[in-house]
Amino acid sequence: MLKNINPTQTQAWKALTAHFESAQDMDLKELFAQDAARFDKYSARFGSDILVDYSKNLINEETLKHLFALANETELKSAIEAMFSGEAINKTEDRAVLHTALRNRSNTPVMVGGEDVMPAVNAVLEKIKSFTERVIGGEWKGYTGKAITDIVNIGIGGSDLGPYMVTEALAPYKNHLNLHFVSNVDGTHIVETLKKVDPETTLFLIASKTFTTQETMTNAHSARDWFLATAGDQAHVAKHFAALSTNAPAVSEFGIDTDNMFEFWDWVGGRYSLWSAIGLSIALAVGYDNFIELLDGAHEMDNHFVSTDLESNIPVILALIGIWYNNFHGAESEAILPYDQYMHRFAAYFQQGNMESNGKYVDREGNAVTYQTGPIIWGEPGTNGQHAFYQLIHQGTKLIPCDFIAPAISHNPASDHHQKLMSNFFAQTEALAFGKSAETVKAEFAKAGKSEEEMASLVPFKVFEGNRPTNSILVKQITPRTLGNLIAMYEHKIFVQGVIWNIFSFDQWGVELGKQLANQILPELADESEINSHDSSTNGLINAFKAFKA
């Protein structure tokens, strides 16, 4: 079980507080000038394909010493062991947390309730293999005998964000099948998607563990109605719909053959479910072998996380540096900035992964915390972000630690595009770290022939303070394996921070209240009668909505 340890009561936290007071004038220019080996000391390699450079952070040896002490005092190692051994560390739902078992390529037994889950995991993988080979190979036929050309994944949250992110990131590996993702209950999403597909050659994947999720089932019923408007016979549904679920009666009632139901388990959290049957759309998009490569990559990072000392453990290092900014520097957000267009949904994926996991104000004993927990996560691909929000990162008043991610080898080496992209990648972290002094600005102005008066009026606006922290994550190439490495790295970073903050990272009760209230409001929207059962604002909005519709 996870221990209940208030991090602020540890000796390490107190030492970090004192260290922060004395280290507020820490300057990256000076840190690099004082230590020619700083990059070597504060960077780590994962295998031969990933380099993590954390040298451009506001840290020194003393900072890291206290951060590792914090990890030890909060018993991080025992927490890691508890998760991987199948203990029910998701206490509020009384569940184990074993997305790692889904990618346990060593097949060593993983016990839940006295039972090894690996045979069941492998059975689902075999079922995915058989199914995807039939669909990709054209053996699976629609109701008119035509092969499938389009896959529509209908899900929401983890049943959508993960598969969508991965299929986009691995687009260079895609086969002939066209992938579409529908998540929003806004009818526009399903209607616009259905305009692009043919009922004779489309396969729908309905991704809902309970087969009751409102948004997913609303879209699923609309898709079935659209399909039957052409196909006519309810029996044809079985050839065009598959389910990623555990509710066999509901799946069967919908018209899906339960042979085409792919199960997963309650120890798989939604935001960690792409490794499970929820990843069926990934396997269909890039092929089963590439899906297994993705699992292999994640398993490699799992092994590193479990077996590596904290001081050399990449997810642990990244997590601790994040805590340094979040809890001591007062940083409220972190930016994830992939310099790879295929990775354009990576930040959005970990926005859910991080904010749904660690957006908690109650500790593991049920008490309100007195310290900051999960940060706001956001980001966009480079170089788009440079022309949008980097201004604030460079010259704004908020400290925003950034992760820059880039591949050394592009899948599209067109002309000199990649060199230009990478020159920006390297330049941005250098600019953020070291800035540009007033003296340098003046010298540039003087060289350009500016007058003293012009210089005096413009210099303050051209100065870059620097000292903006970044991590640089350089990947040889984005492949299924390295993508698996990266996803698992961030997953474990989130876990480490949750352990240290003494919160439960694997529930998400914060999503429930809005859903409950929506279910109460829904019948109130069925007619034109005036509503007065809520507060004045909600009543006014509902009644205005009805008036607009009238």
UniProtKB/Swiss-Prot annotation:
InterPro entries named in the record: G6P_Isomerase, G6P_Isomerase_C, Phosphoglucose_isomerase_CS, SIS_dom_sf, SIS_PGI_1, SIS_PGI_2
Catalytic residue positions: E356 (proton donor), H387, K515
Reaction catalyzed: alpha-D-glucose 6-phosphate = beta-D-fructose 6-phosphate
Enzyme class: isomerase
GO molecular-function terms, A-Z: carbohydrate derivative binding; glucose-6-phosphate isomerase activity; monosaccharide binding
GO biological process, alphabetically ordered: gluconeogenesis; glucose 6-phosphate metabolic process; glycolytic process
Recorded metabolic or biological pathway in which this protein acts: Carbohydrate biosynthesis; gluconeogenesis; Carbohydrate degradation; glycolysis; D-glyceraldehyde 3-phosphate and glycerone phosphate from D-glucose: step 2/4
Cell compartment(s), UniProt: Cytoplasm
Keywords, sorted A to Z: Cytoplasm, Gluconeogenesis, Glycolysis, Isomerase
Gene3D superfamilies cross-referenced by the UniProt entry: 1.10.1390.10, Glucose-6-phosphate isomerase like protein, domain 1
Signal sequence, start to end: none
A cellular-component GO term for this protein: cytosol
Classification via Pfam families: PGI (PF00342)
EC number assigned by the record: 5.3.1.9
Domain of life: Bacteria
Role summary: Catalyzes the reversible isomerization of glucose-6-phosphate to fructose-6-phosphate.
Family of this protein: Belongs to the GPI family.
UniProt-recorded name of the protein: Glucose-6-phosphate isomerase
Lineage, broadest ranks: Bacteria, Pseudomonadati, Pseudomonadota, Gammaproteobacteria, Vibrionales
